[in-house]
């Protein structure tokens, strides 16, 4: 291996004898001191990983000259670790398992095949709300202390006991708690509910346990594979369900701030397969949300490519308003940055206001980074960060080592040192921030709580659009009577029917959650209640939240108002929710009401919750509770009461809102090192379901040929020890002739599997019925399903066919058929395929199967006017050549019909930007550009893609 050209920067850390580091601050001190902190982290990674092949010496100097090279230079980046959630983790780990098989066939030790960096896989996105619970407690003052240990009863088999259901008579008699066990099949089929408010009447604390039991049963096959991965591979850790959301677990348990490998210490950084991986930016860790292929590349030791970004400095000044929560700060910053236009940039926070924000506040702000369009929202490590590490149980000597290292490489933010230079600077005065909500259709549409009533009434009148609902004037004050249980209610525009404290965005923040809990306590003590038809829930980011809500004594009060813990994964945050009561839905539809949902999550786009709830608002957890108490968003919380108690006394929000001092006192008492260490111990030792789950004890995975979820992919079937020379493509047919702005969702849809699709036909051949199809996203570990789903989007427009639909023409026969069926016929005849497209080919979310699928269909070349860069990189990563029409040319100007046959040759000495000649069987000749950006991409292409490139290293 080539010696690292920066080896002269290696030093021993002061105060230690066995810890070394690359002192990048000495590379070019003047230039280094002017770099933003987030760029310094990138520079350190390039210096440490410089091998002269995939990471070159010049890359480091390009970063040092960041201000002049910005947006013009691409640099390689290898993270300290990779984080996967279950949906994206499946295909990545399936590829690793298949690579082991391939290595074994060459007589090599398959145990060599392991991720090149620590990889954590968190199974959190499969949680669905199969159960919520009936409120058994009627007198909160008499409730016993809430236990944090697991019940000793068998999951799902609680002793039956009678208690009044919160539906107030909607059940057929009193709920027989725990009597009905249900099954995963019954829940999947969405059978009628025994109780209008619940899918099953079930007692707390069994609510979360019951949903988790079904989660394990529903996903048993995938979980068994994950468990095998955790045993078979080095550098792989699996965090099972029942733990928390991917980002909360990352923050509480996986983040290191400073990493160590073989005595070398370096900054923590992470690539995660979710846009909200940025949450750990609040802890001073560079976290980037990427797609499946980028994360898999990093796991394989191949760097991803970053364009040197603009870095926007966001200066926070002033002090936080006493009644404003961190969520108010988040929403204010979201709107400010959205308006300032920071899309695609790195945002770095500085100024005297930063020190007023706790790590929980910072991570909440960083979590919302994708909502204002930035790639990164970075808070450099400072004294607040170090104090947080001590508070959460990190060994004090480790914290001291971290501090010494970060000071040595100038990664510790201090007030008395030179400020970095930024591309531009924005200022936000924290004094000006007051409580806000966001909605009713987009997260960037922020409304002051004081203006909420006026704004909602305006939305009713405005034309249908970004905010308006265009309700006729004569219908704006309509009242719809509804019977729910044994009581009569009236619904009107603005009625709240869903109120959910959910998602990692808020649940990580003790002050915000404790404010909600203390507000609930004061509300109950004041005699307020929540109307029983409102679907309320509490979905904590992790068990940490349960711990401090329980220990503070507020959990019973939240439960009294209906905010019951229903599980620890992504539930209502990703739309996994059970339906509203039928009578409420009917009333909403009959009255054409603008019904509302209030959430403390990070997204609320239209249609993401319930179809009959057309106004959705993001709010802080205490405001979610407040609006649930009011029962409407059409209220002035300053001047109108939330409700009346049994004595007829009007109760206003200011009567029950806890002071910042109250919240701080509880937070300082509870957020202690033992809390985090206890939860870490629970994860490691006490997950009974995971511990009892059977998994193979083998180096190679024993593939089950009957499985419809996990299948060995064919990516290595033609693997040779030496990569064969680039072969000419002769007489290729066009599989698809596409236009502009073809998205990755057109290429590989992630939603439900249509009954008439090739994927459905395959699953039916496996004796599955439509209700068992699940989604393309859930079956990413089965290449047979995903290949059949490639270009199966109903909105695809193929010019060969001339109309919308997932069809193409098999040109030799002239027959119109499904894209997969045509590709299969071509492959049987060993005919290569190409795709012709227009501008911006590959728009949309990063999606691994948008490149893997075309490769398995037999596509070897894409010719487009322009590409979305990430997707183009994915094509290269799968061994598909991205070719680009010359400027001013496209298929139409060249007179191409798409029905020709195409022949071309890429030279052995292929270079980025090489001009390639293409001939058609009609005699037409034209030229295109080989759209490779650098020599590393050419190398990967010559190997047939990333997977083959890495596999050959083991041969």
Swiss-Prot record:
GO MF annotation list: 4 iron, 4 sulfur cluster binding; aconitate hydratase activity; iron-responsive element binding; metal ion binding
Transcription regulation is among the record's keywords: no
SUPFAM superfamilies, per database record: Aconitase iron-sulfur domain (SSF53732), LeuD/IlvD-like (SSF52016)
An example Gene Ontology CC term for this record: cytosol
UniProt PTM comment: Ubiquitinated and degraded by the proteasome in presence of high level of iron and oxygen.
Subcellular location: Cytoplasm
ATP-binding keyword on record: no
Entry keywords, A to Z: 4Fe-4S, Cytoplasm, Iron, Iron-sulfur, Metal-binding, Phosphoprotein, RNA-binding, Ubl conjugation
Known cofactor(s): [4Fe-4S] cluster
Binding site for [4Fe-4S] cluster: 504, 570, 573
Family designation: Belongs to the aconitase/IPM isomerase family.
Official protein name in the record: Iron-responsive element-binding protein 2
Native species: Xenopus laevis (African clawed frog)
Gene name of the encoded protein: ireb2
């Amino acid at each position: 291996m080539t010696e690292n050209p920066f080896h002269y920067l290696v030093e021993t850390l002061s105060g230690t004898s066995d810890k070394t580091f690359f002192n990048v601050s000495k590379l070019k001190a003047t230039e280094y001191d002017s770099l933003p902190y987030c760029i310094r982290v990138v520079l350190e990674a390039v210096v440490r990983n410089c091998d002269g092949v995939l990471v070159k010496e010049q890359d480091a100097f390009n970063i040092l000259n960041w201000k002049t090279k910005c947006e013009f230079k691409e640099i390689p980046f290898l993270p300290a670790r990779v984080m996967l959630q279950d949906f994206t983790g499946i295909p990545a780990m399936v590829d690793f398992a298949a690579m082991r098989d391939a290595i074994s066939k060459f007589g090599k030790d398959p145990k060599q095949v392991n991720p090149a960096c620590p990889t954590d896989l968190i199974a959190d996105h499969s949680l669905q709300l199969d159960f919520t619970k009936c409120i058994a407690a009627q007198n909160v003052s008499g409730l016993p202390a809430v236990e944090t240990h697991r019940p000793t009863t068998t999951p799902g088999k609680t002793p039956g006991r009678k208690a009044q259901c919160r539906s107030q008579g909607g059940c057929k008699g009193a709920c027989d708690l725990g009597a009905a066990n249900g099954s995963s099949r019954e829940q999947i089929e969405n059978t009628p509910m025994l109780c209008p408010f619940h899918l099953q009447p079930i007692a707390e604390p069994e609510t979360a346990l019951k949903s988790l039991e079904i989660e394990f049963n529903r996903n048993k096959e995938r979980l068994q594979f994950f468990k095998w991965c955790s045993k078979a591979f080095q550098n792989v850790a699996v965090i099972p369900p029942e733990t928390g959301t991917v980002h909360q677990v990352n923050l509480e348990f996986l983040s290191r701030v400073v990493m160590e490998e073989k005595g070398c210490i370096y900054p923590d950084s992470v690539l995660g397969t979710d846009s909200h991986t940025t949450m750990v930016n609040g802890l001073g860790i560079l976290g980037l949300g990427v797609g499946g292929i980028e994360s898999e590349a990093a796991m394989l030791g191949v760097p991803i490519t970053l364009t040197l970004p603009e870095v926007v400095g966001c200066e926070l000044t002033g002090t936080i308003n006493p009644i404003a929560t961190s969520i108010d700060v988040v929403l204010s910053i979201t709107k400010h940055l959205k308006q300032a236009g920071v899309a695609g940039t790195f945002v770095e926070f500085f100024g005297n206001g930063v020190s007023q924000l706790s790590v929980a506040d910072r991570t909440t702000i960083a979590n919302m980074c994708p909502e204002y369009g930035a790639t990164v929202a970075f808070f450099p490590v400072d004294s607040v960060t170090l104090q947080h590490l001590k508070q959460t149980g990190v060994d004090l000597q480790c914290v001291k080592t971290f501090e010494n290292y970060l000071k040595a490489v100038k990664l510790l933010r201090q007030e008395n040192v030179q400020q970095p230079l930024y591309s531009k600077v924005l200022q936000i005065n924290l004094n000006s921030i007051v409580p806000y909500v966001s909605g009713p259709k987009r997260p960037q549409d922020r409304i002051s709580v004081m203006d909420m009533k006026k704004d909602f009434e305006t939305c009713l009148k405005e034309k249908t659009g970004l905010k308006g609902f265009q309700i006729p004037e004569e219908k704006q004050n309509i009242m719809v009577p509804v019977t729910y249980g044994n009581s009569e209610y009236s619904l009107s525009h603005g009625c709240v029917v869903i109120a959910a404290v959910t998602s990692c965005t808020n649940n990580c923040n003790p002050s915000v959650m404790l404010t909600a809990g203390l507000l609930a306590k004061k509300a109950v003590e004041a005699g307020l209640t929540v109307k029983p038809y409102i679907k309320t829930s509490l979905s904590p980011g992790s068990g940490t939240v349960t711990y401090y809500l329980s220990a503070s004594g507020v959990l019973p009060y939240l439960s009294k108002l209906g905010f019951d813990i229903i599980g620890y994964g992504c539930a209502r945050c990703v739309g996994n929710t059970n339906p509203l009561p039928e009578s409420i839905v009917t009333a909403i539809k009959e009255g054409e009401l603008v019904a509302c949902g209030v959430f403390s999550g990070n997204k609320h786009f239209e249609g993401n919750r319930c179809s009959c709830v057309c106004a959705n608002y993001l709010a802080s957890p205490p405001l979610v509770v407040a609006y649930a108490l009011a029962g409407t968003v059409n209220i002035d919380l300053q001047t109108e009461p939330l409700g009346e108690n049994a004595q007829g006394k009007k109760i206003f929000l200011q009567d029950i809102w806890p002071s910042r001092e109250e919240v701080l006192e509880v937070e300082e008492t509870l957020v202690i090192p033992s809390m985090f260490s206890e939860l870490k111990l629970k994860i490691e030792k006490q997950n009974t379901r995971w511990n009892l789950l059977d998994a193979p004890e083998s180096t190679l995975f024993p593939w089950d040929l009957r499985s419809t979820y996990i299948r060995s992919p064919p990516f290595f079937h033609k693997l040779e020890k030496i990569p064969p020379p680039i072969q000419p493509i002769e007489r290729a047919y066009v599989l698809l002739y596409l236009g502009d702005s073809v998205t990755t969702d057109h290429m590989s849809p992630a939603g439900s599997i249509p009954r008439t699709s090739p994927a459905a036909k395959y699953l039916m051949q496996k004796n599955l019925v439509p209700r068992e199809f699940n989604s393309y996203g859930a079956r990413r570990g089965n290449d047979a399903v995903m290949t059949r789903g490639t270009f199966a989007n109903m909105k695809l427009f193929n010019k060969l066919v001339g109309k919308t639909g997932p069809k193409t023409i098999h040109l030799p026969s002239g027959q119109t058929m499904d894209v997969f069926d045509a590709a299969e016929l071509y492959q049987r005849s060993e005919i290569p395929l190409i795709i012709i497209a227009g501008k911006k080919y590959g728009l949309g979310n990063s999606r691994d199967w948008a490149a893997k699928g075309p490769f398995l269909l037999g596509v070897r070349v894409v010719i487009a006017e322009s590409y979305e860069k990430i997707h183009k990189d994915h094509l290269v990563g799968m061994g598909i050549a991205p070719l680009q029409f010359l400027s001013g040319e496209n298929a139409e100007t060249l007179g191409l019909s798409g029905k020709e046959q195409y022949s071309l040759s890429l030279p052995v000495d292929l270079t980025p930007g090489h001009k390639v000649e293409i001939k058609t069987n009609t005699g037409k000749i034209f030229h295109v550009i080989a759209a490779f950006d650098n020599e590393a991409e050419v190398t990967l292409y010559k190997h047939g893609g990333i997977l083959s490139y890495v596999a050959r290293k083991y041969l």
